Amino acid sequence: MLVCPKCHRLVHAEDLKRLAAEAERSEQANDLTGALSKWREALEFLPRDSRQHQTISEKVAALSAWVDSGALPPSGKSRPSPSQAAAAKKTRLGKAWAWTVAAVVLLLTKGKLLLLGLTKAGTLWTMVLAFGVYWTIWGWKFAAGLVVSIYIHEMGHVVALSRFGIKASMPMFIPGFGALIRMKQHPASPREDARVGLAGPLWGLGAALAAYGIYELTGAPIWAAISQVGAWINLFNLLPIPPLDGGRGFRSLSRGQRWIVVAAMAGMWAVTKEGLLVLLVIVAAWRALSEKTKVEPDQKGLLQYTLLVVTLSAMCLIPVPGMAPPHDTSPQQQGSGQ
């Protein structure tokens, strides 16, 4: 009960005052994520049809936009965005070393959050269970690589949710179905939902690139296999249907932008002949045709979606030593029975 039926006053008025004060302090300290978390919590104590709920919802949407931009509101001190900081540190390393360095940077900058899930019993035990199931099918080395790849993908979602101040559970592994995260609060806008949704494949792409970098350095075929399968799983997640990540990423795109994604999918199918892309093209084209969107064009979302389609599709072609190259139709690979 949020409102007293007799006096019509808010039941949680004191909690609302406390949360508002904490949110204001966080904003003054330029802690936008902390402010978002407090304002979202305050929404839970307000009737949805109240003016206060509408006002705070608008506040959440505004703060979310600032978090997404990587900048601070005009009253705050300026700071470089994550992309600017990364660009300043970029060096002219070789391909393999660049991928390995990127993985190390990810571990150093996000290591605390990346390892956070392992401190939760539910995540750790379901992770071990999934590892055991996959071990019996593919062996322990591939099973370990697959589970870690899925874990990194899911922690991408966790980090994005934390960045926007959205409460959620840690990953829970389900053998054969990957893993899932339960959101305790909902994104405030299609763009926010898209950032959270595409964060998983983006981190998954990083894991696949790191595995391929290790393969280039060591020559061990198992790393090529982990990289290729990880890329395929993340590409599958880009199917633009709920509740997959692609369905969430598609929400923020205008109709014109959706057709650009369809063109990218079709173009990568022409290059790679990856059968999964046919399904992606069909579903994405159907949504672009059948749905009328009223959202403003989302350039960042379009860039992320297109980047993921192109890179993950290309990585599905990674050759694994000892296995036939993907889509090889030569007579030697087809077999003549001789």
Question: PLM features: residue spans?
Answer:
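Inward-facing hydrophobic residues that define packing positions of alpha-helical scaffold repeats
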Residues: 4, 39-40, 46
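Cys/His-coordinated zinc-binding microdomains
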Residues: 5-11
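Conserved small-residue packing positions in alpha-helical repeats and bundles
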Residues: 23-24, 61
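Hydrophobic transmembrane alpha-helices and their immediate loop junctions
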Residues: 61-338
